[in-house]
Amino acid sequence: MDNRPIGLLDSGFGGLSVAKKVIEKLPNESTIFIGDNAHIPYGDRTREDIINLTRRSVKFLLEKNVKLIVIACNTATAVAMPTMQKEVEQQIIGVIQSGALAAARTTKNKNVAVVATNVTVASHAYQKEIKFRDPEIKVTELAAPKLAPLVEAQKDYATNLKVVKESLAPLMGKEFDTLVLGCTHYPLIQKEFEEAINNKEVTILDPADQVAQYTFNVMRRDGLFSDSEKAVHEYYTTGNSETFDKLARTFMDDDTLTSKHVDTENY
């Protein structure tokens, strides 16, 4: 047994989509989430920037004595995770491997589309992971740099839908039956994706469920389950805590959720 918390990090709000599934899957586990909202978006930054910013959040979580870390950010998983795994003793779990596995299992016509940030698409991380599982699957990758900042800006549904439709336009007419939301921000506007795609034959895939299951499996394997009867969930942001709380309370269905501001510059 290990009663230390699970650490989760993201470039901003997006990782809440993963945190929510992890909490649902592991209700006895305490969690600490940090969103680096001050430096969003990661998807347009250099490789060096992404590694350094991810390292700061990892160090912050380690200072909080977490037992494992979930990088709840596709861009950070694609770019920084290999480096972090070399630098840190704790198990580090990313989101891309789980998303790719879910996509390979879901597609029936072996035609998958992935929408993600510029950096994630440029890394071809999803394409590599999906084809590793099934080389016959055709993977179409689409960069949508406007979408993560859109979620952070907390716009209304109509505005979101317009930008999602514009971003997905290059996919219209393609024969994919599975669309991977390759950025953890995107599930926060999944309804807009569903309306924009408007095709019941297409499965819109949020990798968070698979990430939560993999986290469960790792903890069972390594004997990391908590025997605590009451889980505690802490939220931190490098941005404005009031802005963070507004979206987080709605998405996490918790009116009492209160985050704390943290400056990771010195980590």
UniProtKB/Swiss-Prot annotation:
Keywords noted in UniProt: Cell shape, Cell wall biogenesis/degradation, Isomerase, Peptidoglycan synthesis
Residue sites binding substrate per the record: 10-11, 42-43, 74-75, 184-185
Gene3D superfamilies linked to this entry: 3.40.50.1860
EC numbers for this chain: 5.1.1.3
EC top class, as a word: isomerase
Pfam families (UniProt xref): Asp_Glu_race
GO terms for biological process, alphabetical: cell wall organization; peptidoglycan biosynthetic process; regulation of cell shape
Catalytic activity: L-glutamate = D-glutamate
Keyword Glycoprotein set for record: no
InterPro entries the record matches: Asp/Glu/hydantoin_racemase, Asp/Glu_race, Asp/Glu_racemase_AS_1, Asp/Glu_racemase_AS_2, Glu_race
Disulfide topology: none
Active-site residues, record numbering mapped to chain: 73, 183
Described function: Provides the (R)-glutamate required for cell wall biosynthesis.
Record PANTHER family: GLUTAMATE RACEMASE
Family in the record: Belongs to the aspartate/glutamate racemases family.
Name of the protein this chain belongs to: Glutamate racemase
Source species: Lactobacillus acidophilus (strain ATCC 700396 / NCK56 / N2 / NCFM)
Gene transcribed to yield this protein: murI
